[in-house]
Amino acid sequence: MFYGFLLLYPLLSLCLEHVISLSKKGKPTLGFVIMRNAVDIKTLSDVKDRVKNEKRTHCLVVNKYKVNDVLKNKEAKFYFLNVFRFPSVLKLREYEGNLMETGQYNGEVLRFIHSYVERLGGGGTHVGGKADSKADGKVNHDVSDQVVAQQTDQQMDQQMDQQTDQQMDQQMDQKRDAALEDCRLIPLNARFNKALQELMQREGKEIMEGLDMHLEEGDAGNVTVEGVAMEDDSTAHDSVQRNEGKTPKGPLDGQWPPLEELFRIIKKEGIQISIIQLQFGYDNMNTSEILRKIFPTESEVIHKYEMIGHIAHLNFCERFENYKKVIAEIILDKNKSIKTVINKMDTLKNLHRTFNIELLAGEKNYLTTLKENDIKVKLNYELIYWNSKLKKERDRIYDLVENNSIIVDLFAGVGIFSLHLSKKKCLCFSNDINSHAYNFMNVNIKLNKRKSILTYNLDARAFVQMLLGLDIFSSDKTTLSMQLSEQNWKNISLDFINSPDQNNVDTGKRKKRESDRVGHVDDDITANATIDKKKKLRHADTNDPLEERPLGLAATHHGEENIQSVERTNNDSEKTKEDAPRDVTHQVDINLGIYGDIHVLMNLPQTAFEFLDIFRELLDTYSTDQKDFQGKCRRDQMRNVFIHCYFFSKPELFYEDAERNIRMQLGGLPREMKITEIRKVSPSKLMYVAEFNLKDVF
């Protein structure tokens, strides 16, 4: 064992050196987590103190009337300081105290720039000032004196002869103040300092020590965060073509525009150059930059949070337990659209896929509205499952499904798939066992003015059994006769559903509703007034509080629906059950002849495979071994039923898992099956969807 240790000792030292080098570069070190930079971060005030920083950099001293001309130059603009919420042009009067005493340095840099431009082929004579004296090196090193020294010696002599010393001093002060008022400072960034250093070193010259040379991540483009768009610097990276022999581009050769254009402007316009020291802090940084500053080795983990309307949902690992509240305060403070920051306390294990919420910062308000593909979605995040990260998958399904398809969504949540696909004139049967989700499905149908979505609050098995009873899977069935509940009667438009024209609108349903009712409703005025009042509560404006929404429960069996609604008043303790007639239904005929394939959506990755056995009855009904009285195979009389079954699996086992579960539940495998990776839940757990035609299962 001792000899084994001696053999491993050199490797141990190499590993330690590697970890140290990674930590110095601010890179992740796998299991070696360095958190010492954040140990004393307790409050937002601590954060603001920690992120204070200074930049010492070059700046241009420009007359205010020439600033716009300078800023318009795209190549020059690349080298201007661009800091979040910090002005790119400063008033000299306000920042005079930030200018540094540099001795001969300013003049040396200016002479270098002028001579460099002349060697490249001129650049024009600058307008105004004493160009020759600057080019020869006779440059005043105090900027305040530089901007005042515009009068000729003859003018100064005449004034001195005519005025007393006191008057002369007063006049000089006035001229100095006026000159300072007209001057602006344009700070330059680390890219300029870096590129200038490279150029001057090639000629044996050095730039001042202590200048900012740190190229921020923002210098290479905008910074983005998964689940949400962050406010950030908009640093322009203009692609510039140039010929050989011009000014070198600098350290990032091939990406930076040449300094030549900026040098020419400095010489032509008689612009001074100086050194300025600027203070930056919390207000000049976005969320991403602040978190990188505090947690330099861990920030990529923190940044991955989900946005649900005004709610930011974070998933913290244990090592951030002591910092989660201050991180939440940063996110809340730096993103004005965020009002609530929460942490997920546990995994999704219950029937309704909800989780315990820990409020970290902001309002305790989980009723939110979000927008996806021009669809408004209202939900209570505490009561209903929602995942913004599945937007790409919802878009993929939308592109996959043809117009006039039939959608069967077993685990619909707030109904986002149906809300989206109803744009394509699809007839949608949308179900969720969560009564809160069912309630918001109906709210969102009204909110988005959808006309072809039928909603159900059933166990998935009972839901599919109901559809089997309606025989919507038969390709020979052209008319679907069914009884609709009051809620679904309000959700749909028969004119819209029964017309292949997507622009068709309902013109008469509301007027003939009473005459179409199968059930009997008492006709007296008092009863109608009560029902109207409750309808107002049930279909209140979407800006009303959640307490005024129905917590409706519906039970449907073989095409007949019963509904019982529960109303909440502003006082949570007062609850009244609506005596809306449970047996009131509406007989409707739906033209199935205009609809094509059926798409069954099973987005419950944890257990969706377990529900596939529901469709065994369908396979038995349309068996390949049975023929009708005309001798046709029964399977040919079945519509195409495309199954989209979502599941979790390890990346190395996903196909075997899908095949095993499908064979187990359906007793066979489809001829063809497509499996698509949806997203990575963790390194060893991915989400997939298995897609196949149920008609092809043998």
Swiss-Prot record:
Gene Ontology molecular-function annotations: tRNA (guanine(37)-N1)-methyltransferase activity
Disulfide bridges in this chain: none
EC class name: transferase
Any GO BP: tRNA N1-guanine methylation
Kinase among keywords: no
Location relative to the cell: Mitochondrion matrix; Nucleus; Cytoplasm
Predominant location category: mitochondrion
Pfam family name, one: TYW2_N_2
Positions contributing to S-adenosyl-L-methionine binding: 394, 432-433, 459-460, 603
InterPro entries: MeTrfase_TRM5/TYW2, SAM-dependent_MTases_sf, TRM5-TYW2-like_MTfase, TRM5/TYW2-like_N, tRNA_Gua_MeTrfase_euk
Keywords: Cytoplasm, Methyltransferase, Mitochondrion, Nucleus, S-adenosyl-L-methionine, Transferase, tRNA processing
EC number: 2.1.1.228
Disordered as annotated region, ranges: 233-254, 500-522, 534-582
Gene Ontology cellular component terms for the protein in this record: mitochondrial matrix; nucleus
SUPFAM superfamilies given in the database record: S-adenosyl-L-methionine-dependent methyltransferases
Subunit structure: Monomer.
Summary of the function given for this chain in its UniProt record: Specifically methylates the N1 position of guanosine-37 in various cytoplasmic and mitochondrial tRNAs. Methylation is not dependent on the nature of the nucleoside 5' of the target nucleoside. This is the first step in the biosynthesis of wybutosine (yW), a modified base adjacent to the anticodon of tRNAs and required for accurate decoding.
Name of the protein described by the UniProt record: tRNA (guanine(37)-N(1))-methyltransferase
